[in-house]
A protein has these predicted regions:
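Small-residue-rich hydrophobic transmembrane alpha-helices
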Residues: 15-78, 111-124, 128-129
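Short alpha-helical transmembrane segments in multi-pass integral membrane proteins
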Residues: 41-106, 148-200
Length: 200
């Protein structure tokens, strides 16, 4: 994304770097959560306790959603206090603060999809997420952002020449990705339901 935004100039590049850095910092929480939950789910599965594995998988996604919404709220409510930590340039502060509106949505979805993808690996589901990533994040997110920024005539005037189209497209694509992974995980959990659940 940064390579496509660089052609817009220093203001866009600086604002995008602030937004991207905050998104990366926030991502550390769901990444850590996903690693921990997948390790525990795999342990339960390896021990033959499918019920506990299913319960923890569902709990992990709920924790990811709640923590993602909390951090998204912090970004939304505190953006005018957070961005000035990075820069004192008024123009960069204004544009980066506007981008954080979309970064908040981006992170909420990113948190859910991150934990889902780790949990799906516990059931050896890897190909379907790869297809979803390639089609939605690269096709819809990156290519869609490029189209909105440089080729779509109906792009809002205040988005032109800014990184906003890229963040809008990426955020929407990530929301769809998160929903797809939640649906896929629910399907996997139903397919591999514990024996006692199937009997009851």
């Amino acid at each position: 994304m940064a390579l496509f935004i660089a052609r817009q100039g220093a203001l866009s590049a600086a604002s995008h770097q602030i937004a991207a850095n905050l998104a990366a910092v926030c991502y550390m929480l769901p990444l850590s959560l996903g690693i921990a939950i997948s390790a525990r789910v795999s342990w339960w599965r390896g021990a033959g306790h499918e019920t506990q594995a299913h319960q923890l998988a569902r709990l992990g996604v709920r924790i990811a959603l709640v923590s993602g919404l909390v951090l998204a709220s912090v970004l939304l409510l505190g953006r005018w206090f957070i961005v000035p930590i990075y820069t004192s340039e008024p123009a960069v502060i204004a544009l980066a603060s506007a981008l954080l509106l979309w970064v908040a949505l981006y992170h909420a979805a990113d948190s859910v999809q991150c934990v889902c993808i780790f949990v799906l690996r516990c059931w050896r589901v890897t190909v379907a997420p790869l297809v979803v990533y390639c089609s939605l994040l690269w096709g819809g997110g990156l290519a869609g952002g490029y189209g909105l920024a440089y080729h779509y005539s109906a792009t809002p005037a205040d988005w032109v020449g800014t990184p906003t189209p890229f963040w809008v497209s990426s955020s929407v694509s990530l929301v769809v990705t998160a929903l797809a992974f939640v649906w896929l995980l629910r399907r996997v959990l139903r397919t591999h339901a514990p024996l006692e659940s199937k009997v009851s």
